[in-house]
Amino acid sequence: MLSDGTLIVADQRYGLIKVDKTGAAEPFGNFQSIGYKHNPPEIESGPNGVHFSPDKTHIFTADVFSGHIYMTSIEDNKTKIIHSHRYGVNTAIQDSLGNVWFTQSTENNSESRLFEAIGKPISDGIVYRLPLLENGTFFDKPELVVDGMDFANGFYIDEKNNKFYLSETMANRVLSFDLDIEKGELTNRNVLAKIPSPDNMQLNHDGFLWVASPLSNQIYSINILSGE
């Protein structure tokens, strides 16, 4: 949400749309200028996992079908592709050092292959990290951080507590890792909580982790210390 109450929402037709407080919506980010198209079955696009940069000046959007990671300037209303992954990207989030972390849910190049990994567990989910270079661009080859997961989905980078939380959707669990933000490493993998089909997540102001569950049509509030 922008400071004036405007919502920025993923939209297959346009990439992103903005919705004002009256409910009026219009395209945002000028995705068409960089060749964005959604014309199934020939061309499938799947914008997903919309997140602000730490300084709130940009929006990062993953594409779960094409594998593109988009960075949109809020002030200029312009978008560029900062990385094109070989498989779909579920969620992309920038840390305070400028590096972008992202999840590959499965080795999909299409909608049908993505839903194959939702129909049955396939352990090819991965967390990657895309380092920021001194010239302000991103390294062209992402670093593999954690692999072997059953549909890696939404995550949250908790730099204050040096923790990284991740939804492993097809394992019905939320994982917790120790985070070394300087080294870009995740260690001490643990199950924080078991809930059905965990998806996107956000740490609430009360210190509880809010996790969406599409299967149960609920939002779970999880104590990050106890997992309850």
What are these regions (language model features)?
Residues 119-133:
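Beta-propeller blade signature
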Residues 1-6, 34-58, 85-108, 124-126, ...:
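Beta-rich, blade/repeat-based domains predominating
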Residues 11-12, 64, 105-107, 169, ...:
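Short loop/turn segments immediately following the C-termini of beta-strands
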Residues 13, 66, 121-124, 171, ...:
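A detector of repeated loop/turn-to-beta-strand junctions in beta-rich toroidal repeat architectures
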Residues 7-32:
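Beta-propeller domains
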Residues 15-17, 68-70, 125-128, 173-175, ...:
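A short loop-to-beta-strand structural motif that recurs across blades of beta-propeller domains
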Residues 171-173, 191-228:
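Loop/turn-rich, solvent-exposed surfaces of beta-rich toroidal or solenoidal domains
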Residues 20-24, 73-77, 131-136, 178-182, ...:
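Short loop/turn segments that connect beta-strands within beta-propeller blades
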